């Protein structure tokens, strides 16, 4: 007998019918002899509905009261799922985040988990109950309710699995696993049987929405085996674990991409690290996420800096740079929108030199201009024209043989 933590996202519990389906997944694990802790999100789009209600009353709601409001969404789901299990003859009890011992820092809207008192959950498990826990929420030392921000239910599930020393954490979603790339754009995309923590973390940070980066980081730090599974089809999903446990036959394991990227170039800066520090510190204070950065210095010691931002952040970026023009002393700002970022990810790059060269050769063959490049040990990212995005992904997917990936079930 083992302990399984299951997590069901909003789309997987979006109706009473889907909640019944989730209950059957729980029952299957109980029938297999496992103890089960279930973490759930708010039903469907109910969090958006709550946000809209607040907006009807005020343009600037208190962050504390927003956390109080949003935390009610998961409370609906936990009670309904517990009822569904009880109706099938299985003893179940629902807990809010704070009842489950989820202790966080005192930050409203994006709190981090600092400790978990798992004693109450263990007590109920020992009594033979299924414990249903509200994701996305916790409580600070001063007893204020907090929420964990985007991906908070994933993080709750992984944190509980770590604290309880669970054998596994299953993340149920509306997709059957992690794919080599987005199958909505590339029909030859294949489901991966396995992927390493590091690869999944890169893909998550690059916008692959299956798992939140914070949850993957938690799983890696505490060595929690994760499986992303379909809440609809009863089949194996994608197992996320250490690289040493996996087949290492793939140089590239996945391709991530996102559009709505803009390149900003600040021309004619006086060279010096203090100038660069001023630019990026100022942008960071405005919560502008700067991605790829390229610096060039002319023979006359003039510096230009190019960097990419989300297109939604462009106007704020330009506004900040213009405000500090006197301090920065640049000549002009140039921008280029309608861009996209395409990234290849794979632990096999570490021991296979020449992957970036192959990527650029493939893109050149397709007459796709590469405007910016960024690399890490297991990732190469390029910025290309938005109109070339899907063509680039398809070409790279084909070149690295990702359509031939086997989705063989793991044990």
Feature names for model-found ranges:
Residues 43, 231, 295:
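Active-site beta-loop-alpha junctions enriched in small/polar residues
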Residues 134, 192-193, 202-260:
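Phosphate/diphosphate-binding glycine-rich loops and adjacent basic-rich segments that engage nucleotide
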Residues 1-216, 384-385, 400, 404, ...:
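Nucleotide/pyrophosphate-binding catalytic subdomain
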Residues 32, 88, 222, 286, ...:
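Conserved dinucleotide-binding and phosphotransfer motif residues
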Residues 168-172, 226-228, 291, 372:
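Short hydrophobic alpha-helical runs that function as membrane-insertion/retention elements
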Residues 23, 27-30, 162, 220, ...:
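A structural alpha-helix within SAM-dependent methyltransferase catalytic domains
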Residues 57, 237-411:
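A conserved regulatory-domain signal marking ACT and ACT-like small-molecule sensing domains
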